[in-house]
């Protein structure tokens, strides 16, 4: 996979997700939903948005005349949303908010042209009220899905319904878990004729 972005994207060696980057990219390229399981510290949270950028997702990769959309990346807690955004921006050597930013209650560090938006799952849930098809996004990463909060459970159900409909076949969904719940999450997203 060639890097379509103007960014220099590096993947720290030693992280399991970096080591399996090609496999993850192939899965993202071929499937609408992928489930990534890996323990804490495997690089899921920081490397998956960079992999999505490498696949041509996010506003900075929009072609002329194409609707520019973001990579949405949910975190269960506000502090995680802001610290993960800072970390990814640092790894991409870009100012916080320019390419990667965050939005949490009472705080928004996101430029109009940002490609990756870190947020709490509650923020994304609230956005379903004003943007029911989640048109602002070309990719949604639901991180730490094993935490099974009401917000996460509702979002997973909402996304499944959205993907079943005819209007968002372009949307990619990545669900991450620190536990081996892959089969349960895959069954949740499997359609009658299409396994997840």
Regions found by a protein language model. Give the residues of each.
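Conserved P-loop NTPase motor core
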Residues: 1-196
């Amino acid at each position: 996979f060639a890097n379509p972005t103007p960014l220099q994207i590096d993947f720290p060696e030693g992280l399991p997700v970096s080591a399996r980057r090609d496999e993850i990219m192939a899965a993202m390229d071929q499937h609408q939903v992928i489930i990534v399981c890996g323990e804490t510290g495997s690089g899921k949270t920081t490397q998956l948005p960079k992999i999505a950028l490498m696949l041509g997702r996010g506003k900075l990769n929009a072609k002329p005349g194409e609707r520019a959309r973001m990579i949405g990346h949910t975190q269960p807690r506000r502090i995680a949303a802001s610290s993960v955004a800072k970390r990814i921006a640092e790894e991409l050597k870009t100012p916080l908010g320019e390419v990667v930013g965050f939005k949490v209650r009472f705080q928004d560090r996101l430029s109009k042209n940002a490609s990756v938006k870190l947020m709490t799952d509650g923020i994304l849930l609230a956005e379903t009220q004003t943007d029911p098809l989640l048109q602002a996004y070309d990719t949604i990463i639901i991180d730490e899905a094993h935490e099974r909060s009401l917000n996460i459970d509702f979002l997973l159900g909402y996304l499944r319904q959205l993907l079943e409909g005819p209007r968002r076949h372009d949307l990619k969904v990545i669900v991450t878990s620190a536990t081996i719940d892959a089969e349960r999450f895959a069954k949740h997203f499997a359609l009658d004729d299409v396994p997840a």
